Amino acid sequence: MSEINQNVKDSRQQYYQHISGQNLTPLWESLHHLVPQTPNANCAPAYWNYQEIRPLLMESGNVIGAKEAIRRVLVLENPALRGQSSITATLYAGLQLILPGEVAPSHRHNQSALRFIVEGKGAFTAVDGERTPMHTGDFILTPQWRWHDHGNPGSEPVVWLDGLDLPLVNLLGCGFAEDCPEDQQPVTRKEGDYLPRYAANMLPLRHQRGNSSPIFNYRYDRSREALHDLTRMGDPDEWEGYKLRYVNPVTGGYPMPSMGAFLQLLPKGFASRVARSTDSTIYHVVEGAGQVTIGNETFHFSAKDIFVAPTWHEVSFRSSEDTVLFSFSDKPVQEALGLFREARY
């Protein structure tokens, strides 16, 4: 029987080599992988201790200037995706440093980008002719094809977490970019111009709707206050604690079409139940400390640390003190395609 099986195997292998010359391959050899019963893990659970990598990030300031680098970033590469500049199969993340007196030159691209400020003060981001100051915990958007630059006229280094849909856009083969003739784009609107127009539950009469939120700085003091107020309204969700999502005030949807962003508070002593979802999610610890179990791995985290939970991995949290987590994922894309799924246990 084994001899017959080996003969069949050899015959098939000869056939596969024969059809390969015509750029053909047999589906039956890969069908179970292509159409799995449950999602294939396309990245691995991973964790970055900020206090360990911070000296390396600061050292990059001596290696290259912000203008030469264009964006001086240490990419957070998933250990299962080394060499691909990806933290998940669809998303990119990195830590960007801008030193006092530096400017990160203006450019634009059709990849959507988000910034979450990790530390420092005195820097700004300019988007589409308007500047906004960057404070720790602020969530800042640079939407598709909008001119944006960063500057630091302050006296201390400023670091933020970058999140982009680079792998997704590159997979689709539709990436475009353009450099601005000047390092800094002209400022055409007053600082805070977006606030009375879009951040007070009202809209200008003749607002022209785009595909991203017109609010490009979701200030942490306001978001944190919302979480605090929510804790007074009832008990936390058993899986997520107190969790809110950032929204586009025009549509009620996500701030950007390809990435959803969230902020959640885990009260001191909170132990969540287990959940999993199809959107691989990147987490940044804004405040607090605790531990997270992702699949079979447990990571102990503290403020400013970063970790990633891959698709369809069971996730649970324990907080040793009041903890605030910022997170982002490709959930909007999955929902738009009717693919998103979650389970709670």
Describe the residue ranges of each PLM region.
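A short, N-terminal "cap"/entry segment at the start of jelly-roll beta-barrel domains
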Residues: 1-88, 185-258, 262
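C-terminal structured domain segments across diverse proteins
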Residues: 250-252, 259-265, 275-278, 288, ...
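Conserved metal-binding segment of the jelly-roll/cupin
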Residues: 127, 133-154, 160-165, 294, ...
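Active-site lining segments that contact anionic ligands and/or coordinate catalytic metals
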Residues: 241, 258-261, 279-280, 287-289, ...
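Activation on folded, globular domain regions of eukaryotic proteins
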Residues: 47-50, 94, 161
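Double-stranded beta-helix
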Residues: 2-15, 153-216, 319-345
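A short beta-strand-loop-beta hairpin characteristic of the jelly-roll/cupin
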Residues: 99-136, 142-146, 275-303
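A short beta-loop-beta micro-motif enriched in histidine and acidic residues
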Residues: 81-92, 99-113, 129, 251-260, ...
